[in-house]
Amino acid sequence: MASMKSLATAILVVLLLAALSREGRSQNCSAAIGELMTCGPYVLPGNNGAPSEQCCSALRAVNHGCLCETINIISSLPDHCSLPAVNCAS
């Protein structure tokens, strides 16, 4: 379970760093992605609770394009690190 917490934390940090590294995006995108850190406890495997209102508010504040671009960056990480693609369906 500790490794899953570490993975979830790492993913959230990557989200933040990916948003911060995009100079073409406004600081609003970076700040909004950073606010998603409040969703950290909800994204851990085994969590059956509902996300906090703070998490939901942060998610509502993120621009759709900003969120999609950040997710695309994260999904490309295995390739950039010479790792096999992640297949969540299997």
Swiss-Prot record:
Keyword Signal: yes
Disulfide bridge positions per record: C29-C66, C39-C55, C56-C81, C68-C88
Gene3D superfamilies: Plant lipid-transfer and hydrophobic proteins (1.10.110.10)
Keywords per UniProt: Disulfide bond, Secreted, Signal
Localization terms from the record: Secreted
Coiled-coil residue spans: none
Signal peptide: 1-26
Gene Ontology cellular component list: extracellular region
Superkingdom in the source lineage: Eukaryota
Protein family: Belongs to the A9/FIL1 family.
Protein name: Protein LIM2
Lineage of origin: Eukaryota, Viridiplantae, Streptophyta, Embryophyta, Tracheophyta
